[in-house]
Regions:
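Short glycine-enriched nucleophile-adjacent loop
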Residues: 35-46
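Alpha/beta-hydrolase fold nucleophile elbow
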Residues: 21-32
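Conserved alpha/beta-hydrolase "acid-adjacent" motif
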Residues: 143-149, 174
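Short beta-strand/loop motif that positions the catalytic acidic residue
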Residues: 128-130, 136-138
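Active-site nucleophile loop of the alpha/beta-hydrolase fold
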Residues: 52-62
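Alpha/beta-hydrolase active-site loop
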Residues: 2-21
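Catalytic histidine-centered segment of alpha/beta-hydrolase-like enzymes
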Residues: 169-179
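Active-site nucleophile elbow and catalytic-triad environment of alpha/beta-hydrolase enzymes
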Residues: 107-126
Length: 192
């Protein structure tokens, strides 16, 4: 029920609360779509000390190029452009082999599935507000592994503490398998 931009604003309020409580170092991260949101956050809002992307997921540009939901994305864009952002769009989402039906406002749908929007990880990485340590952890059995670091990681502003780590895992098990390396990286980055 909330646009991608609105979701990032909610995250921004959380970051502000942590800062106001005296936290000096704040990371933003997540797994799959959460990783996508962490990357988008640094592009749209910024102000965190590091970004952690575990098994990054949701690739609207690639989905659009393959024709997945293309007509619905175009319809949602038209509704938004025509001032009818509240029109409902019904679609079936495919996530890790699971199908689920949704009915959402056109502006919400388009904000998440816009091939050139915040969900486009390569574009968002290239638009980081400033250089921050960026950790990308991907499993050997994740479909995105074939794209390598050039897909989005390399597009972020360079930082000497950024790392691209490959673990022997699938999309779902990457956080568990990579947990020790993530903890070590956080400890390293937090020393600065």
């Amino acid at each position: 029920d909330e646009t991608y931009e609105g979701t990032l604003q909610s995250l921004s309020e959380s970051v502000t609360r942590y800062r106001s409580k005296g936290y000096k170092t704040v990371f933003i991260g997540g797994q799959s779509f959460g990783a996508n949101a962490a990357i988008a956050y640094q592009a749209a809002v910024g102000g965190v000390d590091g970004v952690i992307a575990l098994a990054p997921g949701h690739s609207p540009y690639e989905m659009y190029q393959m024709g997945l939901n293309r007509s619905l994305i175009d319809l949602a864009k038209k509704h938004v452009t025509d001032g009818n952002a509240g029109e409902l769009v019904e679609f079936t989402d495919l996530n890790q082999g699971q199908r689920k039906n949704f009915s959402v406002r056109a502006d919400v749908f388009f904000s998440y599935f816009n091939p050139d929007g915040l969900g486009n990880m390569a574009l968002s990485a290239s638009r980081f507000k400033h250089s921050v340590p960026f950790l990308w952890v991907i499993g050997t059995q994740d479909w995105l592994i074939k794209e390598g670091s050039a897909y989005a990681f390399d597009k972020a502003p360079q930082n000497p503490q950024s790392r691209y780590i490959v673990v022997n895992a699938n999309h779902a098990t990457t956080p568990e398998v990579g947990a020790d390396q993530v903890v070590d990286w956080i400890a390293l980055v937090s020393k600065r």
